[in-house]
A protein has these predicted regions:
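N-terminal nucleophile
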Residues: 1-303
Length: 303
């Protein structure tokens, strides 16, 4: 997955809202969202059929997990307009998501992620959140856990440490190539989401869907900007030739009133495919949270 937008505890009545675009090689096989059996309960997640596991999911305790692949550190020999290519021989990052979905809370998931084996995976960022807490794991050879405050968080394929939402008061990443298209995308998307969340008269899902469809440089039906430096990967909806691009998009809203929770998804790029209402899957998952759910999870894990 390449663009992950999370609004955590900043929308009244909706403690967790997610928008996510998955960019991947078009030939890589996958299944769409479905309810599946995890090791400690049920989960709602798509499935990667090439390596197993998944790139995002929600469990029946209300823990959301989403992973984005990280590019190598900016170097002269790294193509800023190319896809993220994994080193062979390392363990699948999809199994990290599946393991995190076994947790009873975001805090529990983050504690387990902090114990990940050193050097076992290609680089990634993984965000876990429930209705109370959110954590970001940045993994480059070893895990680093960041506590996220309430607000808007946008995660992509670069470790954007200038994100004041994620690292308040820290001025990191100044040596990063600010012209990198993925860095520009994170800044643009963050600004757009902040504006949309303040528009009380607009449906939040419709606004997020519009962002997920966007192309930069005047290409496509939802085009923004006209920079000559725009590239495929500055767009939220990516079309990088015949082999790589946005494969699917997902919108998730967990409301305090569970009957008002929503799930929309596309099978294909959202600029070409309409969002389908997948909310019945979310209702069938029957998300539970709070002390009762934690007690049930503890009972399950002791069996």
């Amino acid at each position: 997955m390449c663009t992950l937008i999370v609004l955590h505890r900043c929308i009244p009545g909706r403690p967790l809202v997610v928008a996510a675009n998955r960019d991947e090689f078009l030939a890589r096989p996958a299944e769409g969202p479905a309810i599946r059996e995890g090791r400690s309960g049920r989960i709602l997640a798509p499935r990667d059929l090439a390596a197993g596991g998944t790139w995002l999911g929600l469990n029946d305790r209300g823990v959301f997990v989403g992973l984005t692949n990280l590019r190598p550190a900016i170097q002269d020999d790294v193509d800023p307009d190319g896809p993220v290519v994994a080193k062979p021989g390392l363990r699948s990052r999809g199994e990290v998501v599946m393991a995190a979905l076994d947790a009873g809370s975001a805090v529990e998931a983050a504690e387990a992620l902090g114990e990940l084996e050193i050097g076992a995976y290609n680089a990634f960022q993984l965000l876990v959140a429930d209705e109370r807490e959110a954590r970001l794991t940045v993994y480059r050879e070893r895990p680093e856990i960041i506590t996220l405050p309430p607000g808007v968080h946008v995660v992509g394929n670069v470790d954007d440490r200038n994100d004041r939402d994620r690292c308040p008061g820290q001025d990191l990443g100044q040596k990063k190539a600010t012209g990198e298209p993925r860095v520009r995308k994170l800044s643009r998307v963050r600004e757009r989401v902040e504006k949309i969340r303040l528009q009380a008269d607009r449906d939040l899902f419709e606004g997020l869907a519009g962002i997920c469809r966007e192309h930069v440089g005047g290409v496509g039906t939802q085009a923004v900007g006209s920079s000559s430096a725009a590239t495929h990967f500055e767009s939220t909806c990516v079309h990088a030739g015949e082999a790589y691009g946005t494969r699917s998009s997902l919108l998730l809203e967990l409301a305090e009133d569970r009957e008002r929770s929503r799930l929309w998804g596309t099978d294909g790029p959202p600029c070409e495919r309409p969002y389908e209402d997948l909310s019945p899957l979310l209702w069938a998952l029957d998300v539970r949270s709070g002390p009762a759910a934690e007690a049930e999870h503890e009972t399950r894990t002791k069996r």
